[in-house]
Design a protein with these regions (language model features):
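Electrostatic cytochrome c docking/interface patches
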Residues: 19-38, 54-57
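Short microdomains enriched in Cys/His and/or Lys/Arg
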Residues: 65-76
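A mature extracytoplasmic/lumenal domain signature
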Residues: 50-51, 65
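The canonical Cys-X-X-Cys-His
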Residues: 35, 39-49, 91, 104, ...
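Sequence context surrounding c-type heme c attachment/ligation sites in exported
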Residues: 33-40, 62-67
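Short acidic/histidine- and often glycine-rich active-site loop of Leloir-type glycosyltransferases
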Residues: 53-54, 72
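Axial heme c-ligation environment in periplasmic c-type cytochrome domains
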Residues: 54-62, 77-111
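Sec-dependent bacterial lipoprotein signal peptides
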Residues: 1-18
Length: 112
């Protein structure tokens, strides 16, 4: 009986440690980490720290596709699918981030 209780306890502990309530991948790639750093350093002044929520000035961008992210960063123009939170809000183009677009996409695609 003690042996069965011990095995049940082990299985229960294994199941609990296997649960992941996070929206981030269990294994974060370097690209994911770079994207997270860039987002939390440069984007949260307008977007929310949680990309699924609207920010102070800008809408949520969770799960945005690569082309949309690229276009917004390179031109700053609003596109179908992401509407400005304020009618006159404009995003400044950030062409210096061109090489980091894949990193931002890697991070944002985890928030769907």
């Amino acid at each position: 009986m003690e042996r069965i209780c011990f095995l049940i306890t082990l299985v229960f502990i294994f199941l609990l440690t296997s649960c992941n309530n996070s929206n981030k991948p269990v294994y974060a790639t370097d690209s994911f980490k770079k994207g997270e750093t860039i987002y939390k350093t440069l984007c949260i002044s307008c977007h929310n720290v949680d990309p699924r929520k609207d920010g102070i000035l800008a809408p949520n961008i969770a799960g945005a596709n690569y082309e949309l992210i690229k276009s917004m960063i390179m031109t700053g123009k609003h596109h179908k699918g992401i509407e400005p939170k304020w009618p006159d809000a404009k995003m400044a183009p950030l062409p210096h981030l061109k090489e980091h677009i894949p990193d931002l996409h890697e991070y944002l695609k985890t928030f769907k």
